[in-house]
């Protein structure tokens, strides 16, 4: 294997993890033998005979190396439109139809700032699922349809030595302009490297962090994306008890039972269909999920 040194300007994954989960991720990396140097930046990459030999840091010290991997994040290239007044905070501003300040010019993907569902304002959420959906919406509107984009949420998924980490929406309220308006709930199981955090505002989920145990991560993402009021179960979500099961069951049943559901405009098929709520299948799913969850935590 390789001897790895990681240079970070402040802390590990600071843009998506809060302080506690960042420290846990750092600990997992260090257990793998990775040396982490924090609060330092690169001044120069030195070479000998055309090959990398060392990295000089901003304090003048050097880190000998034979390979450099650069992963400094995403910076939208806005030069094409920077003189048009169409720049938002970090990217090209678009409306709900993916139009820029010029109605016949559309933009989508990592270069744009779109409506962020959890933040309730424009934000640059640069990831593949968002870019893919935005591209489809932009294409439909360019072709003459009038299809609004519902908005995006930030989401990052990684794994460190088999320990999964998922970050959704707002994960560090203190970094937000209105940080005091948020409420958080946290669950920790230290011996299993488990850390879970939910972020609320006005009884709606705005973000979540899952480390080591994904639990109902998919359901949580859906609650954030749809901005479902969760006040009645807010204090019990992380316990994953019957109150959460019942809430999710009722939500699913209300959405599906007896309704004719239209495929989204971006789907190839546009044929509506009826879909009923299967009580037996849902009960079996709940039972299987609880059994699997209990086995995982006993290990």
Annotated model-derived regions:
Residues 111-217, 266-298:
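Mid-to-C-terminal Rossmann-like scaffold of FAD/NAD(P)H-dependent oxidoreductases
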Residues 2-96:
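A Rossmann-like FAD-binding core segment of flavoenzymes
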Residues 47-53, 101-102, 160-161:
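A short, glycine/Asx- and small/polar-enriched loop/turn
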Residues 53, 61-87, 163-250, 261, ...:
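C-terminal catalytic lobe of FAD-dependent flavoproteins
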